[in-house]
Amino acid sequence: MKLALLPWILMLLSTIPGPGFTAGAQGSCSLRCGAQDGLCSCHPTCSGLGTCCEDFLDYCLEILPSSGSMMGGKDFVVQHLKWTDPTDGVICRFKESIQTLGYVDDFYQVHCISPLLYESGYIPFTISMDNGRSFPHAGTWLAAHPYKVSESEKSQLVNETHWQYYGTSDTRGNLNLTWDTSALPTPAVTIELWGYEETGKPYSGNWTSKWSYLYPLATNIPNTGFFTFTPKPASPQYQRWKVGALRISSSRNYPGEKDVRALWTNDHALAWHLGDDFRADSVAWARAQCLAWEALEDQLPNFLTELPDCPCTLAQARADSGRFFTDYGCDIEHGSVCTYHPGAVHCVRSVQASPRYGSGQQCCYTAAGTQLLTSDSTSGSTPDRGHDWGAPPYRTPPRVPGMSHWLYDVISFYYCCLWAPECPRYMKRRPSSDCRNYRPPRLASAFGDPHFVTFDGTSFSFSGNGEYVLLETTLSDLRVQGRAQPGRMPNGTQARGTGLTAVAVQEDNSDVIEVRLAGGSRVLEVLLNQKVLSFTEQNWMDLKGMFLSVAAQDKVSIMLSSGAGLEVGVQGPFLSVSILLPEKFLTHTRGLLGTLNNNPRDDFTLRNGQVLPLNASAQQVFQFGADWAVSNTSSLFTYDSWLLVYQFVYGPKHNPNFKPLFPDETTLSPSQTEDVARLCEGDRFCILDVMSTGSSSVGNATRIAHQLHQHRLKSLQPVVSCGWLPPPANGHKEGLRYLEGSVVRFSCNNGYSLVGPESSTCQADGKWSMPTPECQPGRSYTVLLSIIFGGLAIVALISIIYMMLHRRRKSNMTMWSSQP
């Protein structure tokens, strides 16, 4: 009887509303957030398990909003904590060193103001309610790159181009600024200019970054959400700042007061505040700045050798999502507004900064999928000395997100290309990478019932019920695990097929990310170190050892520091997962997704090294899958309900009592065969899933997932590149594509003649069929022919005139001799 009641007991336990607390427990979460020992728990999983200390939410804080710009000034409120006692002062301390003043509002809610930071990602903070004597309350704040927060959280430069070209050509007049007054509830505001600089010897210990308050544009003006002014040149002591941002804050604050509630503009080129010398001759001023940048750049280390080569095609760039990600400044999915790269439809950036110099790669592509190179056009992609997204450990040059990039790569572009005609100097020091050394990553996937396609191309099905090792690597201690659970038949009974319901990943000592279906639904839930994340504010997160992106409700992308990448998405009632591994992982993998070594024959390798043949029976393959079950000590999964605890912690990781439906155990009726053939279009995985679940929708989802895998695999096929081919001196070329089969044609300027081949073809061996020809001084064929025919015409004309004159003379002589 007790055994029969157990499933019902588990069901009731799993539906206990959270957060739950351990009744009567005397323990406290003061200074214990994350701890699981003691009489009660302060761990994030305690809410679902009902084991929390009674003061859990008072000390382990939830905040709203939970994120904001790294520029600071965001007011956030602590949820659940009500403070009715008198307080000497509220102090919020970020990263154990940066303190801001908080307050208690009229509703007894505690507030903090986020500080100005030089890094992005999750920032731990603590709160003191006794003016700094103790900090027992703890939480985390997500600091985001300024360009990745919503526009409503910033003040807006109306016609930003006008601001950044002010003083050039005939760009004059008023400048306008707007903001959302509800985001800054105060009757009067002050508008200030802040400047950013990095000082000290580059790449030394005294290289520092700093935001500085410069001067006010307006003080104590009504908070109307609009400000207009005519810029005047700044005083000489402020003109060394060329990059900065405006800050709007309450007029109650003293000038330049740090870390107060405020709205910032985007960082921008401060053309509008530069001196009279800039306004008198902006081209000469910018040229001098460009030459100075050029001289400094030539003294700095060469960062280009550290950068990865760009993918050869747009398809490769979009498919290689572990190493490259969309550049928000040129996104094909958002209208291809490519301000700095006209002619491009999409750009990507290398996800990880280079290890030594913190630099970044950029790759841009045309609508035809061809890479745009600076050697051919100023619209080409340009690498960055400072990665736009920054680089851990952040805080110091050139690793400050956004700002280091502005100083070393963007403002110099204004000097050389936008304000002065010196762009070749810039492009020489920021040349596009071609793709001769690019190697696409290797792809493996799992989807449907589930079905697996290994890195070496072996495909099989394994309907296990449990938690399994999808991938382990010895190169970087990368671990990817999957949880598979039974599906449901159309009549509600348990199917004899399973599917992935959770995927977890960790690399070395990185954070742990788990992606799962929430509560048996088709809604994705993402957990960071066993705590559920919210994506209502941010869809991009900088985490320890990885980046996380949620571009849609049904897909999560995880980019690891090694260059490996995962994409987890919803396909029907289950999850699908695709894993991308760079070539360096060759011979370093094991698990259900095989041994990556270009040899599919050893993909069914057991833990003990025994290898099953590729023609192993379905039952043997099932035993292979079961052998890769995880253990309690190695599991990356979160067990935050008693149902999960009893099933996967107290129970076996692989359920030996679950009997899947093997392909040879069932057949379809003729009518079913016809329906399935029409639905599945020959996809055997789709057919198997219709048979095991009785659901055509499940089969269709599997077919789509398989097609997506095949499409990505096709996009990632290696492409031969012959590299950039220059035009001849004093001539030009036709053709900007340098991949196998491409033809480049040559011609010469007037006054020069072509010596050598008229075209060259990129061959399969990566070499051009012909070298670039020469254009030698001399008359071109066109000019020569013109001279020849012109000379002949002149000779003919002289001959005609001579003949006419001769005839006239003869006629005159005849007339004279006939007179009397």
Curated annotation (Swiss-Prot):
Question: Extracellular topology: which positions?
Answer: 23-782
Instruction: Please state where this protein is localized.
Output: Cell membrane
| Main subcellular location of this protein, as a coarse class | membrane
Task: List GO BP terms, alphabetically.
Answer: negative regulation of cell cycle G1/S phase transition; negative regulation of cell division
Which residue intervals define the domain VWFD in the entry?
442-636
Q: Where is the signal peptide?
A: 1-22
Q: Which SMART domains match?
A: AMOP, CCP, VWD
From the Swiss-Prot or TrEMBL record, give the protein name.
Sushi domain-containing protein 2
